């Protein structure tokens, strides 16, 4: 009897676009040699909605509801970047109270985003319990958002020159109570997860990125800081009122999935410190500035000769973007979220280029998963933290 002949072929597997661990509509074409990954090709574009083109025929206020659909888990950051550009073009001074309110909202949004990263990341590698715990704290943040903005998600709260409404009565006390409660929650997560031997087996030494490699790929956010690069735009660019608070940049040297987890856990604690300081030191005064003070270059102005305009807040404003270009950026939960804005002396931007952190961080995925096991793809992709809304735009 002749023995059956065996063939050793590579196998091609489709992961996604409807797989639960793909975090949206990402499709990976994975080439396998047994359990080992030989090649991985991400296929993007399933959630492309033409966000950059839509911006070119909308005023800034009309465009604000659209931007919350990029990274729909950290909508305050997309709103912040959308109004920061026109503010810098128009030389609009933001009142101190409005700046403090913005910082509070941004840091609450950062915590909510990191929480909804942590739960699915743990579920991807087999730990179901934290997935239910994180919704408990995240629900409290959404209650705070709803009280201040009227919306739990897609808040539409930031405005050119300030915010849409002041903080309601009793909101500050409620937020301080949340901060005290949340610190005990983070301690609970660390006790449950950080020293868990099964968790450490799955993430330690998996998906290592060196510091030089991270810089060469243009990575940002926790991906960059977990590779030993101490770079945070809140410290570098000095935007809003971050310089007035005492906090530390969270970073690790190892560059693996565990380091990225530790950076994000540390960032949640630092965000609570920033929120507590902002709530205790929030000044009085207006929450918006509807006045533009800008040089009128056509009149050959003399020193201190400014053109004054008033922005109407409720309807679409007649606020013109002056004829210049500008790149603005903020430190979003996933990395550097930037806008390259070109004005054309019109109420519509001539060009609105989005620099999404998730799209650029995702580029390194094929390199990270090569020569790893199939099961490690979930760990590595989860540690990158992507949202397909901002990847595809």
UniProtKB/Swiss-Prot annotation:
Main location: plastid
A single cellular component GO annotation: chloroplast thylakoid membrane
The protein's Enzyme Commission number: 7.1.1.-
Localization of this protein: Plastid, Chloroplast thylakoid membrane
Matches recorded under SUPFAM superfamilies: HydB/Nqo4-like
A biological process from GO: photosynthesis, light reaction
InterPro entries: NADH_Q_OxRdtase_suD, NADH_UbQ_OxRdtase_49kDa_CS, NDH1_su_D/H, NiFe-Hase_large
Described purpose of this protein according to its UniProt entry: NDH shuttles electrons from NAD(P)H:plastoquinone, via FMN and iron-sulfur (Fe-S) centers, to quinones in the photosynthetic chain and possibly in a chloroplast respiratory chain. The immediate electron acceptor for the enzyme in this species is believed to be plastoquinone. Couples the redox reaction to proton translocation, and thus conserves the redox energy in a proton gradient.
Name the UniProt record assigns to this protein: NAD(P)H-quinone oxidoreductase subunit H, chloroplastic
Organism: Nicotiana tabacum
Gene: ndhH
